[in-house]
Each structure stands twice: as structure tokens, then as C-alpha cells.
Amino acid sequence: MDRRAAAVADLERRIGHTFADRKLLELALTHASVGDGAKKAGDNEVLEFIGDRVLGLLAAEALAERFPKAKEGELAPRLNALVSRETCARVARGAEMGPALRLSASSSKIGGRETDSILAGAAEALMAALYRDGGLELARRVFLDLWAGEFDLANQGKPRDPKTALQEWAQSQGKPLPTYAVKDRKGPDHAPMFTVQVTVVGLDPVFAEGRSRQEAEKAAAKALLEREGAGI
């Protein structure tokens, strides 16, 4: 058994489910960067789209059960925190999904297995695959298990926007405001992927990816803050 196959088997043990549809699991773990030369039959973009909705339903349901007297305005920021890209990436790391992913050689070489956008997308795709393979009850069980440690963090409310935090930090250092530039756009129109560069005078620029320009800018701002030891 090769290293990736072992990682996939470990992931199934970790979530407590062996997929009946092996192609479905493989699809959920295949990133769009994998090219035709790697015998790709598809990637996880559509499953990611479905998984985002499955995750939203399960998170909303779980919050409503935990806080039966809470109003919509109180639940909304908690829901946003539970389904955020940062949270999904953290959950994927906790489940050790990275080694199980199929990436292009170039994406793997530059650390794609630890990239928030790739990990978060894989976590969403996995939820869709679980829903399709075993139904909503299975997806709910795995969600409650993998996201168990995230509910306390969600109760703290919505974190500061990374771009706002970076702007405030730059000003506190006596620097001009950060600048953002789109360096690349790839993928189909229904599921584009943007690469954005953020620059603060006097510092090396940082690059990040996202499914929208705004998402990529936030990811880049967050990465720069973390690199400079000023995380939000």
C-alpha cells in the first residue's frame, strides 16, 4: 500500500465510515490542480459546492438545538464561524486530510496540502461525499464529531476581518495602507480560483488563493499577519 492509499484508509478509520462508492471518495479528495495526465476523471469542485450547503444545514441545525432560545441575529455569526474557510481548513488538518489529497505535482511541491483554500474545499467535498454515500444521518454524525471542538470557538462570535486587521497593523507600524493585486485567475467561470498578492511597504509580498477576489485578499492578509507574528 502506497503512502497516499494508507492516508486514505486512515481517514476512513478516523471518520468511522468505509465508502461503498470508492469513486465518490476519490473524487472528493481530488483537487482541480490535478491534470489530465494524472488520469483524472474529475475533481472535487462540484462536491465542494454541494458540501458547502450540506455543512450549512448541519451547522444551522446543531446551533438551533444548542441554543433554542437564541434569535437569528445571535445564531448567524456563530454559523458563519462554523462554516468559515478558516474553520473548515482547521477541521481538515485535525482529520489529517492533507496526506490523502490528490494534487498536481506543482501544487504539492509548494505546500498545497497545507493551504487553507485546498483543505477547506476538501472538507466541504468530504461532507457532500458522505451525504451521497450514506445519507444525511451519516453526514450529521461525522460533522458533529469533526466539528465538536469548533462550537466553543464559534460562541466567541465573528473574528475580525483580516484585511481590516492588516490595515490597522500597517498603520500602527507607520506604514502606508496595504495594496492588493490579482496575479492569476484560473478555472471555469462557475468555479474560478484567484491568486492575489498583498504588499506592505518594506515587507516581502504574500500570495494566496481564493474562490473570489475578496476571499483571496482576506487569505493573503491573514497569511501576512501570521508571518509577521501579528495574527488576528
Curated annotation (Swiss-Prot):
BP terms from Gene Ontology: mRNA processing; regulation of gene expression; rRNA processing; tRNA processing
Reactions listed under catalytic activity: Endonucleolytic cleavage to 5'-phosphomonoester
Record GO cellular component, one term: cytoplasm
Location of the DRBM domain: 161-230
RNase III domain: residues covered: 8-135
Binding annotation for Mg(2+): E48, E124
SMART domains xrefs: DSRM, RIBOc
Co-factor requirement: Mg(2+)
Keywords in alphabetical order: Cytoplasm, Endonuclease, Hydrolase, Magnesium, Metal-binding, mRNA processing, Nuclease, RNA-binding, rRNA processing, rRNA-binding, tRNA processing
InterPro entries: dsRBD_dom (IPR014720), RNase_III (IPR011907), RNase_III_dom (IPR000999), RNase_III_sf (IPR036389)
Annotated EC: 3.1.26.3
Subunit structure: Homodimer.
Protein family: Belongs to the ribonuclease III family.
UniProt name for this protein: Ribonuclease 3
Organism field: Caulobacter sp. (strain K31)
Underlying gene: rnc
